[in-house]
Amino acid sequence: MKILLLDNYDSFTYNLCDYLLQTGADCKVARNDALSLSEFENIDFEALVFSPGPKRPADAGLMPALIARYHDSVPMLGICLGHQALGEFFGAELVKAAMPMHGKTAEIRHSGHPLFENVPEHFTAMRYHSLLLRSLENTPLECIARTGAGEIMALAHRSLPLLGVQCHPESVLTDFGLQILKNWIKIAASARYAGIDRQTHGTLP
């Protein structure tokens, strides 16, 4: 699978790239302000990954425009800032977290979505963020992982291969981070994604 990793000026982007390469994928990295939208269209890629980064999605160069351009034709994975960008694009509200979580781990509970295949229902993940998506109500997105406090930690579009994780799978302090990325590659590569039986996993209210 040919992946284009959009670098939102995050210091761990190349850790993420290395993990993606370990899955067997081909991964190219481009800064979010390095190319025009038309230049991105000349790159040969089959899936998009949006890296973590500072500030808000609106400050992340071409990331919002790439989501608008490719959301209905290219599989996507948003991580931290990228997760927030996907949520905002589909109408979710991005708010300040009650407590900033920079370099802190948390226990995450997932719903059984294929993104978490072979990952225990409860696992530990690293968090670096002060903003989060408050609700996915009235959007085409579903929550597929939360903290014990109910904070949204992962989302999935209900009919498109678009996924987001607020935590950092590229961190060594995230359990099963590489497995999560392998699962996403499997989802992105599968032409049958839209036909997955949604009754095989739940959502988290």
Language-model-detected regions and their locations in the chain:
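Catalytic beta-strand/loop cores that center a nucleophilic Ser/Cys/Thr
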Residues: 114-160
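Two-component/phosphorelay signaling modules centered on CheY-like receiver
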Residues: 17-26
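Cysteine-nucleophile active-site neighborhood
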Residues: 45-117, 181-183
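Active-site-adjacent helical/loop segments in soluble small-molecule enzymes
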Residues: 13
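Extreme N-terminal starter segment of soluble prokaryotic enzymes
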Residues: 1-4
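Acyltransferase
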Residues: 172-205
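Short amphipathic alpha-helix with an adjacent loop that forms part of the alpha/beta core around
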Residues: 35-44
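Short hydrophobic/Thr-rich beta-strand motif most characteristic of the beta2 strand and flanking loop
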Residues: 26-32
